[in-house]
Structure formats: C-alpha cells, structure tokens
Amino acid sequence: MAQFFKAKPNSSKQLSAKLSLSVNQLDHLGAGIAQHQGKVVFIPGALPDETVTVQLTEQKKNYARAKLIKVDTPSSERVEPECPHYHTCGGCDLQHMSLSGQREHKEAALLDIMAKFAGAEGGTLSPALTGEGWHYRRRARLATLFDKNTKHLSLGFRAASSSNVVPISQCQVLAKPLSDLIVPFAKLLNQLSAKASLGHLELIAADNGHFAVLRITKALNDKDLAKLSAFAEQHLIHICLQDNEGQFQGVGAELVLPVYQLLGDKAESDAVSLSFTPGNFVQVNGQINKAMVAQALDWLAPAPDERILDLFCGMGNFSLPLAKMGADVIGVEGVAEMVTQARVNAKANNLDKLTFYHGDLSADLSLEPWMGKIDKLLLDPARAGAFESLQWLKKMKPRKVVYVSCNPASLARDSAVLLERGYRLQQLGLIDMFPQTHHIEAMALFELTK
C-alpha cells in the first residue's frame, strides 16, 4: 500500500516562524490569549490589548502555545517587574502587570469560573481581601544545587516548569528581613564541609522571631555546627536542622517553635495565637490570613453554644478563633501531626470548647459518635477540594457553610453540589493571598434555603 507523507503539526518550520498577534484576554493561569488561524494561542507574559511578536512553541489540534519575543504595543496595565530574577525564577508570573490589573483579572476569572461551572451567578460580590503587593511572604523554601565540578552550592528557586535552580540574591515578595538573609546564607552554606549533603533551606518570619530550617541528609560535624551557631547569633535567627526522618534539632539552643497571631495582639485578652512545627502548612501571607479569619468569623457569626464543624482544620487557623468567640468547635484534619499541634494550640490559648480529631475526610464522618448535630460548617480544603466530604455532609444540613478555597475550579465544582442540595450562594469574595502571581483564592458563604 502506498504511504504518503503527512507533515507533523509541530514541524520545525511552523514553530520557528515569528508571528504578530493581538492579545484579547488572559486565561485563568495568567497567560495572554490570542487567535491565529482559528486556534487559540496561549502566550505567557502577554497582556490584553497588546500587539506582540511571538514564536510558536507547541501546536495542538485546537490550540497552540507561543513564546513572547517582543511587545510591540504595550497595555496600559504593563509595568516593569521589580525583581531582577523575574524572567528566570519560577516564583512569580504577573509582575509585568499592575497590582490593580492583577486583582481585576483575578476577580473576573473567579466570577467566570463560578458562573460557567457552578451556575452560581447570584450572591453579593464582597470586596476583595487585599494587602501589600511586595514583601508579603512570611515563609519560603529555597532549593539548593551542588555542582560537583566547581564544588559550589547554589541557593535559589526553581525555574518555571523545571527542576533547574535559579540562584537569587533577593526576593521581592519575601519578607524583607528574610530576603536580606539569602546572600549571607548562600555564603555560609558554601563554607560548610557538608555542603554536598544539604537539601532545601526554609526561611520563616514569625511573631516571635526569624527562623531557618536546613534540610540535611547526614549529620553535620562540630565545625559546621559551630559555623551555623555563630551565624544564628550574628543574625538573630533561630536555626534548626531537619534530618531524613523528618526530626528537628535546634542549633546552638533548644528548638523553638514559630508563633503567629490569628486574632488581636498577644497582650490583649482576646488574642489567639498559633504555633507550628517547621514543615507544617501555614498560610504564608500573614496580613491576608488575619483578614481572612476575620471575614470567616463575620460570615459565620458564631454564637455561644452553637456547634461548628471545621473540616481540613490544620493546626486550628479557623478553629481557634471560632472557639474564642464562644462556639463549640469540632476540628477534623487528615494529617495526624497537625492534629497533635492543633491540640497543643488549643491548650496554649486556654480554649476548652474545642475538640480536634484525626480522620479520613473522604469517609463518612457523620457516623462518628462525636459528630452529633452541626449548626454551621467551615471548609478549608487543599486544591483538590471537598467533593468527597460533601457527599456525607448532606446528612448534617448545617445552616451556613463558609468555603475557603485555594482553587476556583474545585470551588466551582463543589459549589454546584451545595446549590443542588438547597443552599444559596450569599457572598463570594476574592482573597489575594499571592500578589504578583496568577494564583486565585476565594471565600464563599452558602445558606440553607430549604
């Protein structure tokens, strides 16, 4: 049988060609969208209302991807990125857009996803929770890369969609005291005899000081420990080591746990604080986390003796303040270590109307003897959402549901389930937890109507 040559869609001739395209919108991941020969073309770094020169990098049946070569006609929202590492580091992807433009885009994207996939067009759009656009991160993990040829250890962040480490000298979204430690730490780590055995470095800015967690794959000798101890004393920072088993050891002093305030000031009687073990999940934007907790309290309006269920409760980010307001709170978390720390936090805050349980949140927890009647519900799941949990929660019929989401796609899917079960979307608001990036977080309030 005769066979005829058919050009592959990703031929080198097609991909090497440069095109001039007009960008009309952003996708939900922050890439510009243009049209070419009936296809949608995604262009990272391009903004709406721009004319750009691009080079195709990938051709599919219904879409293509392109690399931005030049901005021919810039958008009024285009700004010069503040970070010198922006074009190589994979941490931020919207520094080229004004902060107001970023927030307008995120809010529009949130509404679009909710309307398209949940049919949730009602409710009141609440003002976005916003804060500082720079130096807002109180926690970051830096990667290390040891070059066997040069014997040099690089410290930085991963490049976008790559395992390569981009050495950095500063980070414009990291808390300034932590950013200022990057270069000194890079010099210190290169002075250690065990530098080939070092893993990531985590930097934390807490209310009780600054912390560094250094991952090690083998024990350090006394000389290396002495250098770390001297560095900690010089820079007024707590340093701890994390070994292969995940155990932590303080350097030059006993291990101190970082502490964050959730409500009020630590000197106030109504203050609530949260301590955590390095490695546990906490919200990296402290300013926005406080605003988020306050909004959740306002929307749920906990009353004394109401029973509130907090699913995916972590170490008590919402449970602790809810209990402080007088409600009886049940917190359920799937990670046993975080449940242990949540109980420590409840005791430290003198909260006795609060109980934490470790459980599989995809299982039917309504059958547990401790569950009982639930008046209100708070959900704060990971990116996968709470679809499995919502299957058994229909038995509980809480009057109010506050859903805190770090993924609008799973929020929309789960919202559709709640709407089908007689809930009405009352409030929806953007949470700008990660300025200078495309990431969208949101909070939604649902009330039972039937």
Swiss-Prot record:
It catalyses: uridine(1939) in 23S rRNA + S-adenosyl-L-methionine = 5-methyluridine(1939) in 23S rRNA + S-adenosyl-L-homocysteine + H(+). S-adenosyl-L-methionine binds at residues 283, 312, 317, 333, 360, 380. CDD domains: AdoMet_MTases (cd02440). Transmembrane segments: none annotated. The active site is at 406 (nucleophile). One of its GO terms (molecular function) is RNA binding. This is 23S rRNA (uracil(1939)-C(5))-methyltransferase RlmD. Signal peptide: none annotated. Its EC number is 2.1.1.190. NCBIfam families: PRK13168.1 (NF009639), rumA (TIGR00479). Keywords: 4Fe-4S, Iron, Iron-sulfur, Metal-binding, Methyltransferase, rRNA processing, S-adenosyl-L-methionine, Transferase. It is an enzyme of class 2 (transferase). Belongs to the class I-like SAM-binding methyltransferase superfamily. RNA M5U methyltransferase family. RlmD subfamily. [4Fe-4S] cluster binds at residues 83, 89, 92, 171. Residues 12-70 form the TRAM domain. It comes from Shewanella baltica (strain OS185). InterPro entries: 23S_rRNA_MeTrfase_RlmD (IPR001566), MeTrfase_TrmA_AS (IPR030390), MeTrfase_TrmA_CS (IPR030391), NA-bd_OB-fold (IPR012340), SAM-dependent_MTases_sf (IPR029063), TRAM_dom (IPR002792), U5_MeTrfase_fam (IPR010280). The keyword Glycoprotein does not apply. GO terms for biological process: rRNA base methylation. PROSITE patterns: SAM_MT_RNA_M5U (PS51687), TRAM (PS50926), TRMA_1 (PS01230), TRMA_2 (PS01231). Gene3D superfamilies: 2.40.50.1070, Nucleic acid-binding proteins, Vaccinia Virus protein VP39. Catalyzes the formation of 5-methyl-uridine at position 1939 (m5U1939) in 23S rRNA.
